[in-house]
């Protein structure tokens, strides 16, 4: 691998990750606060909720995180391989990332901190889906066969679709993914456990789709880093994104678009939008180098895991801090606006925490660079860092 590829930076990947995180942790709460304060039109609020069937803006958040995980994997792991073979550093990195994301997922949503076997859910969070997709993609990355790499996502996608089509139906408790979920849970958690309350979401069998989505991101990175010129790279990405989107729309004629179980019609549409969104940002920021005014979003992209944990595990603490800081604001903006005001302050609190985290990270990098005689590479003037260090996905 050339030195150029080793130091390649993808500003657009951090930007897309940041936009996804800002939507989840800042924009969503702001919209709900505005709705609580003044009431927003139902069509607007429908875009910020998960329905059983259909596709909303809110539905794209989780698939996009999994997609970006796969996109970042080659950037993080290829430098831990030697002549295409994994080193000890490769396996340590994969094991650490998988374990970290899995445990943090159980902290965020699996209630592991209760230490109550009747409360704990072993597998029910976005971070764990990222870990699952990460492991599948990392292992497939070891193959030297391009045919296997191309066939794997197709087989995962088709296999999952066939299973759901041939067994069960597409109702909340009658689909095959749900039946498989219950069968697995009965064998690993106590009877009567809260883990059985899945709210229609499925995880174990649906891991096939998490692998598919991660591999979609992996192949997009392969296209971007290929020897093709920019025009052909763009054409390939647009063809892939448009093809996936069209496939999703076509499948929707027979297969319901259902996010909680990631039906093939939903997943193909989600991946189509992810590929197209990244293509646009790649052209704007990595090709045309238009990057001004994006520092806050990039901050969220580079420290997405910190922002995510603030939004989930430490959500009560963030909200309480916002309440303390905003307690006098009703005198200025009125009581009616307080839900929206609290959401604004909570967003500022999360942004402040992420900024502090970035300063700590940059200081650590600077000290390491000084310890290495100033040879350690730092941040560029445009604020971009290599995409792979983001804890949430690589």
Regions from the language model: what does each represent?
Residues 1-367, 393-394:
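Alpha-helical transmembrane segments and their immediate juxtamembrane cytosolic regions
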Residues 372, 379-382, 393:
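Acidic/polar hotspots within intrinsically disordered regions
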Residues 383-389:
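Short, low-complexity intrinsically disordered segments enriched in A/P/G/S/L with frequent Arg
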